[in-house]
Amino acid sequence: PQTLPATDLPVRVVSANVLLVNPLVARLGDELAAEGADVVVLQEVTDEVLAELERSALWTDYPYRATAPEPFYQGAATFSKFPITHSEKILLAGHPMLLTDLATPAGPLRVVNVHTVAPLTRTDARAWADQLQALADLVPDSPSPTVLAGDFNATLDHAPLAALASGDVRDAFRVAGSGFGATWPRWE
C-alpha cells in the first residue's frame, strides 16, 4: 500500500449503507451531500435506490458516479467530485464490490466500496473472513493509494478486521478521532 503524500488537499470520504428498503433514501442523499465529502460510497444499492437518489442533492452535487446496482444487499454506488478514470465490479471471495479509480488534485486514488457478508452463521463467518483477507491481498497490488470504505460488518474488535487495519493500512476513524466509526450493528 502507498501513503498519500501530505498535502493541503485532503480527500474526505463518507460511507453509508442505505439499508436496501429505506423509504428515506432521497433524504439520506441530501444529508450525505450536505456533509461536503469529496467521495461518497453507498452499499445495498438497487435500481430503485438509484432512482430515489436521482432526486437528491447527492446526484446533482457529485457529477462523477460509478454504480453497480444489484437486487438485495450486494449493490453499490460511488459518488465523486473528482473524475473517475476507471470503475469495475470485482469479486472478492465470491462477493461483488465496486472498485473505482479517481483523479484527485493530489494524484490518483483508488476507492474500494466494501460490503462484506455479516458473520451471523459459521458459513457466513468463513466467507466474511475470506472477504477481509481478499481485501488485505488487494491493497498491496494497487497501483495507487487505496481507500477501503464501506460496511465491513465488523468492529476493530473482530480479529480479521483488526488484522486488515494493521501495518500500513490505517483506520481513518481512529486517525480522525471523531465521527461515527461503527460498521456493525448500527441500526438507528
Question: Residue locations for each model-derived region?
Answer:
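N-terminal membrane-anchoring alpha-helices
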Residues: P1-T7
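Soluble catalytic domains of enzymes that build or remodel membrane lipids, polysaccharides, and related
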Residues: L9, V13, L19-A34, V39-E188
